[in-house]
């Protein structure tokens, strides 16, 4: 009974800190129609033109011959075409493999030119927290606040993540935090499949170098990308998966992304269950 009372108090404290102030919402929520339950994206664009929209070279104007009605085409402008999807991903893999430390990996990403997001973002958002911590959280991509600060999860969703960690006795000195994509996509749009595929080798190397005991996938994109599943987050959250870091096999736990919880606060009760499972795993 004492254990049940303690868990109940912790749950109420979690709800209070997370901003839940009502037992029921104004509108009914269909929990089987989660907005993140969409098919897994393809791992690469079918062509460079699809991967890099808006970069087509305009057609060359025609030059009229003197004294005639026919025309000849002017030489086409020479443009540097973006690398093919396969070449871009292979380049990223080769570069990431050469990083022998997290510091070297960060420095490498600072100068890596294989991802177009680097040219539109304010700065690299590499990681935050303690790389020697037992747990590593991975989201999808930085937002506006993260782009400005140069750190992941510092906006509203980051504050909620901090509260969720605090509810089970954790803080950023005990956890390591990163994203699949380390640069903010323009307008906070979703990263393209090619952008995620190019950045993935760096994240995998980052996980290998940090070598956490437990990996927490925040949201569906992180879960599907890292765990190779096509199932939606409503089916995968709260389930333990195996993940090979390159050094050893560790446990991975998918859960809802804090940004989703801000939009769907009633789902926080399920996230709380996931974090209780995480707390138990860390204590074991």
What are these regions (language model features)?
Residues 1-17, 22-25:
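Non-catalytic accessory regions outside enzyme or core folds
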Residues 6, 21-22, 26, 30-31, ...:
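A polyanion-binding, active-site-adjacent surface
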């Amino acid at each position: 009974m004492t254990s049940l009372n303690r868990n109940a108090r912790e749950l109420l404290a979690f709800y209070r800190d997370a901003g839940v102030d009502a037992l029921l919402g104004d509108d009914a929520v269909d929990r089987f129609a989660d907005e993140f339950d969409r098919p897994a994206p393809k791992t690469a664009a079918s062509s460079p033109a699809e991967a890099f929209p808006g970069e087509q070279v305009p057609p060359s104007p025609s030059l009229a011959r003197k004294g005639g009605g026919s025309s000849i085409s002017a030489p086409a402008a020479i443009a540097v075409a973006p690398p093919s999807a396969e070449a871009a991903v292979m380049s990223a893999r080769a570069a990431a493999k050469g990083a022998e430390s997290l510091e070297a990996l960060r420095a490498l990403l600072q100068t890596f030119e294989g991802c177009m997001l680097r040219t539109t973002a304010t700065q690299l958002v590499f990681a935050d927290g303690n790389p020697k911590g037992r747990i590593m959280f991975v989201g999808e991509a930085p937002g506006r606040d993260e782009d400005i600060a140069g750190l992941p999860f510092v906006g509203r969703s980051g504050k909620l993540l901090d509260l969720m960690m605090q509810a089970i006795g954790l803080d950023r000195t005990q956890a390591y935090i990163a994203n699949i994509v380390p640069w903010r996509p323009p307008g906070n749009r979703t990263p393209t499949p090619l952008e995620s595929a190019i950045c993935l080798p760096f994240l995998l190397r980052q996980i290998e170098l940090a070598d956490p005991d437990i990996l927490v996938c925040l949201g569906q994109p992180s879960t599907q990308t890292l765990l190779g599943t096509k199932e939606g987050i409503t089916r995968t959250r709260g389930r333990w998966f195996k993940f090979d870091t390159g050094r050893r096999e560790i446990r991975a736990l998918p859960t809802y992304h804090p940004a989703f919880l801000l939009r769907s606060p009633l789902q926080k009760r399920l996230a709380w269950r996931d974090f209780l499972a995480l707390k138990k795993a860390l204590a074991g």
